[in-house]
Amino acid sequence: MPSALRDARSRYQGGQISQQTLRAVENAEIRSLIERLRSEGVRIVTDGGFRSYDFLEAWEGIRRKGDAGAPSGKELEVTGRIGLFHHPILDDFAFLAANASDDVLPKQHIPSPGKVLMRILRETDAGCMKSVYPDLNILLDDLAAAYKKLLEGLYEAGCRYIQFEGVKSMLTDEAARLNNRVLRERPEGLFVAFHAATDMLIRLRGADAYFLDYDCGICDRSRLLWFVHEREAVFGFVLSYYPDEEELDELQAKMEEVLNYIPVKHLTLCLPDADNLLNPSEEDEEKQWKTVGLAKDMADRIFPV
């Protein structure tokens, strides 16, 4: 995260600036990010995760508890049937698209339906949940309908590329079913990539691309690689850190191992998520940009023209 945005967010949380002022800083940094990505030769752009709200804040029927006496981990309250009227992410994408030139594709990141379901179940008191949703299937129906509306809204705004972020280790049957249902019901022509733990990906049906944490300790490598065989797999060649130049040979060897399972025409590279850095600094930010250049070098090795 840029230092100017970190500072603005800190001042906003301290009551020193308004939400409108924070939004203006976010907008400026997103414009700078788009232009920097273009100058680096990147053709898919995002807002960098620079917006500052909770994804569930705009949902109907659910809110964050305001009392400090809430049980630990039970921070959400279901107040009625869950749904969506207008999510601010629609306005955020409109801003991203308006500032993206014709030679780049704007991509929107969204928590996966299964991830949202599991968060609601984990952070809501069971008694409160039962009073509104005595049958879990009704909750699944409401979440599926809300996501359908959100994806249709994004599609109407011009979005053609969504990346769902899924859970990293835990999975329930209900979460898997919900993910697959939302994928089935998405607008035709909406490309969806899915980034999640191995177990989630193996049970996923209908995604266009898979973001794979190949170096993840919970990853059953051979099982996962056979799963993505003959699929349009997006392979993340590094997970939790930004590599140095001297590590390229090692990373190339890992990529070449993957080519035993995935045709090169179905393979691409993705960079580690900046959110993996717990305390981002200006030095980390510069290393992120250096990694963009290293990724281009790696792509030249793996995908020679």
Predicted regions, residues:
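Domain-level signal for soluble alpha/beta catalytic cores
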Residues: 1-305
